Amino acid sequence: MMITKQSYQKFALMRVFVFSLSAFIFNTTEFVPVALLSDIAESFEMESATVGLMITAYAWVVSLGSLPLMLLSAKIERKRLLLFLFALFILSHILSALAWNFWVLLISRMGIAFAHSIFWSITASLVIRVAPRNKKQQALGLLALGSSLAMILGLPLGRIIGQILDWRSTFGVIGGVATLIMLLMWKLLPYLPSRNAGTLASVPILMKRPLLMGIYLLVIMVISGHFTTYSYIEPFILQISQFSPDITTLMLFVFGLAGVVGSFLFGRLYAKNSRKFIAFAMILVICSQLLLFVFKNLEWVVFLQIFLWGVGITSLTISLQMRVLQLAPDATDVASAIFSGSYNVGIGSGALFGSIVIHQLGLGYIGFVGGALGLLALFWLRFITIKFKKT
């Protein structure tokens, strides 16, 4: 009997690991343009701020597609659906690696965005479902760890490959790694019938939960502020701080490493006082952005800011996702789809705001504007915390 239990635990952990790897590759490809922005812009003879709008387009496709695509796929067995999504993901990366102009690259990114739309709508609930008993919160933390490792390994390695070969090779390698993950998924995941996915009728029910709606708005606000700055952090470090390309790569690595710390802190502290934990994470993100330009030439201070920023944004993202699942246990996939859509509205809006700031004020101002948006989000958090104190 003990062997059976140990075997169950082993396979359950391996399945969680597969989802963590999947999160790693999806987050790597979503944000790797941030690390390659200057190279892509140079190859197409475009400005970084213009190429950065590719991040906006990707995010808005995800935000618009998450809920309708999730509803269309609500009754599809989840393992089959995941394998289809990875096939689309891989084919789109092949096109990215072959992109002969910016528009072909943009089209390939839209294919990836469609896969992303459904993947993040169903993954949080699935990883909790396949996790060992009494390890549900830790499983969500491991999923977030995969996302953090994308920042630690995915983005710096993507940048290194782009520097040694070219940015197209980075997308080709991502497609190759995704193929290996797809094979692991096919081998390890069990049959996963759709459960508690919700339907179109779930949407108005969720809309009547004011705290849930308040959290979705909070997500849009705080992520808009974050990506106003983060979308252009690579050119900021190179051009404003005037640090070397190697230091820039190392700073991206530190940002991702900080995400692991954020995941660990979530697992240890979130359950003790979720409201204070969310507020503290937001303050870390806001202060890091507001002070970015002030200490732009002090290398060790910028490293510290990047680290605290990474800790804050990872802690915040997992916490808000957990809160959404807690408030909508009857329609987890629909709630997650709206969360993913809201998050990507924030990404797209932030990248757009950052582009406008660069054109109107200059690259050096992105931290001030991003931090100001974060302050508005902090006031909104305070408002909903007081209004729904007992929820």
Language-model region placement:
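Extracytoplasmic
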Residues: 15-51, 66-69, 229-234
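Helix-breaking motifs and short loop linkers at transmembrane-helix boundaries and internal kinks
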Residues: 45, 77, 98-104, 115, ...
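Conserved MFS/SLC helix-loop-helix module at the cytosolic interface between two early adjacent transmembrane helices
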Residues: 64-103
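Helix-to-loop junctions at the C-terminal end of transmembrane segments
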Residues: 66-77, 262-274, 358
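Paired small-residue
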Residues: 92-95, 103-111, 300-308
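Helix-loop-helix hairpin linking two adjacent transmembrane segments in secondary transporters
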Residues: 104, 133-135, 142-189, 232, ...
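Cytoplasmic helix-loop-helix junction between adjacent transmembrane helices
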Residues: 108-146
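C-terminal transmembrane helical hairpin of 12-TM major facilitator-type secondary transporters
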Residues: 276-320
